[in-house]
């Protein structure tokens, strides 16, 4: 499976092996070749997962509470938060099980651990696919709201958005279940294709939106006979925002999909084996992305922040 390291870690913990690395990483050790391996403490990983879990739960609760936020855009943001919640939750669950197995606090059979591993894999990959798809859906929604403003409410109707959301969830869960059960490497290629598609989609749409915004700002500048630097400053700020948005997406997701690509194309190569040993680092970056997503897409909304305060006050 693409997550060979995680599976070996679960089964290795069950059998009380001294180390919990992937079989690819062990092969690299036998060669004696030096590998750069970054260790992520379980406590840090679980702490980041908990922050992501709480943060995204608050986003879902705030959107569910306020009927004014039941618009197409916030539906996509809510689903993004829910999928990010599942990404962090599934990885936290696996890490917690490994810790309990290693501590001897959880006794179970290898077959049960294998079933648990497959279940976590399905949950992880389906939620990752959903997260990627909903990031792309938000980009499309923003694009339509800008370039088809007069037709937006006729294009992005709530029933149509609900069908899109249902299709994304069903397709992600179904494909992850089938591919992880029957075709081990296909799920890696599927995730890679979705990642590259969403990256290109976001880049094209946001660059087009930035270019149109710069043209609009330039038109206003000419209309009011202002100096060009004002327009240039707007363009630089927009370019910086776009760079940060795409950069965070690529830096957080890119290493994980590099891992999946190498698992498919060079599973036994020495250099690839060294990269596989840092699989937990790549998962940690994805968890960091699930923490950043609400800051980018949700908490910039004043309406949502007000509702979030109400949710927090009610919880006390």
Swiss-Prot record:
The chain crosses the membrane at residues 38-63, 73-93, 119-140, 164-183, 192-210, 240-265, 279-299. One of its GO terms (cellular component) is plasma membrane. Pfam families: 7tm_1. Residues 64-72, 141-163, 211-239, 300-316 are cytoplasmic. Keywords: Cell membrane, G-protein coupled receptor, Glycoprotein, Lipoprotein, Membrane, Palmitate, Receptor, Transducer, Transmembrane, Transmembrane helix. PROSITE patterns: G_PROTEIN_RECEP_F1_1 (PS00237), G_PROTEIN_RECEP_F1_2 (PS50262). A lipid is attached at residue 314 (S-palmitoyl cysteine). GO terms for molecular function: melanocyte-stimulating hormone receptor activity. InterPro entries: GPCR_Rhodpsn (IPR000276), GPCR_Rhodpsn_7TM (IPR017452), Melcrt_ACTH_rcpt (IPR001671), MSH_rcpt (IPR000761). GO terms for biological process: adenylate cyclase-activating G protein-coupled receptor signaling pathway. SUPFAM superfamilies: Family A G protein-coupled receptor-like (SSF81321). It is a multi-pass membrane protein. It is found in: Cell membrane. Glycans are attached at residue 29. Residues 1-37, 94-118, 184-191, 266-278 are extracellular. Belongs to the G-protein coupled receptor 1 family. Interacts with MGRN1, but does not undergo MGRN1-mediated ubiquitination; this interaction competes with GNAS-binding and thus inhibits agonist-induced cAMP production. Interacts with OPN3; the interaction results in a decrease in MC1R-mediated cAMP signaling and ultimately a decrease in melanin production in melanocytes. Receptor for MSH (alpha, beta and gamma) and ACTH. The activity of this receptor is mediated by G proteins which activate adenylate cyclase. Mediates melanogenesis, the production of eumelanin (black/brown) and phaeomelanin (red/yellow), via regulation of cAMP signaling in melanocytes. This is Melanocyte-stimulating hormone receptor. It comes from Cebus albifrons (White-fronted capuchin).
